[in-house]
Amino acid sequence: MKMRAVAVFTGMLTGVLSVAGLLSAGAYAAGGEGNMSASATETNARVFSLHLGATRVVYNPASSGETLTVINDQDYPMLVQSEVLSEDQKSPAPFVVTPPLFRLDGQQSSRLRIVRTGGEFPPDRESLQWICVKGIPPKEGDRWAEGKDGEKKADKVSLNVQLSVSSCIKLFVRPPAVKGRPDDVAGKVEWQRAGNRLKGVNPTPFYINLSTLTVGGKEVKEREYIAPFSSREYPLPAGHRVRFSGR
């Protein structure tokens, strides 16, 4: 699973206070009689991340869709935004996720439905897309983020640090002609020397994801997956034996 995080900083003093104005607010709080005391200043940090019910989704092009469970492990609500991206994670893939945006309360779960909307995929091998799910924090004034009583605390100087996390898992489009499982064919990967590089050749219709790749007792960190019927090179210290394990 891949994760991207974006930090959002907000501050509030009986409504709105910018981060840049925090120092002046602190000085105000420590000021003369009738002002807020320093003890009324608080810092809150919240992570808006979601737990996904699977590490990958296998999609049969002939099916009517697949589902993915999304869990909010936090004690506060957040918006859930989902999309499917192409293999390079830069452009939209021909899939739709429903609902695309919704509120998920704390300690609750829901299901996403992924449906293909078009696109051409090779009939003899897997294709890789990415399902990305992001937890979105509220903006100042968002009513969906209010408490059960509909009120917000307005008597404290506060600095809110909100971390929005996007989690992406693999979506494998596996046509009916591709039989078996990747675990059954991982041992068929052929390893070759290519100068000071190690070349892995994948003769199978599956994406081979290397969970570990060890050379001379040292783990190779650059161990990206090997696409079907293709190859990938990895750095290789000379004169070492290779061990690997795949998904």
Curated annotation (Swiss-Prot):
Signal sequence, start to end: 1-29
Subcellular location: Periplasm
Keyword Signal: yes
Main function: Involved in the biogenesis of the AFA-III afimbrial adhesin.
Protein family according to the UniProt entry: Belongs to the periplasmic pilus chaperone family.
Name of the featured protein: Chaperone protein AfaB
InterPro entries (alphabetical): Ig-like_fold (IPR013783), PapD-like_sf (IPR008962), Periplasmic_pilus_chap (IPR050643), Pili_assmbl_chap_C_dom_sf (IPR036316), Pili_assmbl_chaperone_bac (IPR001829), Pili_assmbl_chaperone_C (IPR016148), Pili_assmbl_chaperone_CS (IPR018046), Pili_assmbl_chaperone_N (IPR016147)
Gene Ontology cellular-component annotations: outer membrane-bounded periplasmic space
Pfam families associated with the record: PapD_C, PapD_N
Keywords: Chaperone, Immunoglobulin domain, Periplasm, Plasmid, Signal
SUPFAM superfamilies hit by this protein: PapD-like, Periplasmic chaperone C-domain
Gene Ontology terms describing biological process: cell wall organization; chaperone-mediated protein folding
Predominant cellular place of this UniProt entry's protein: periplasm
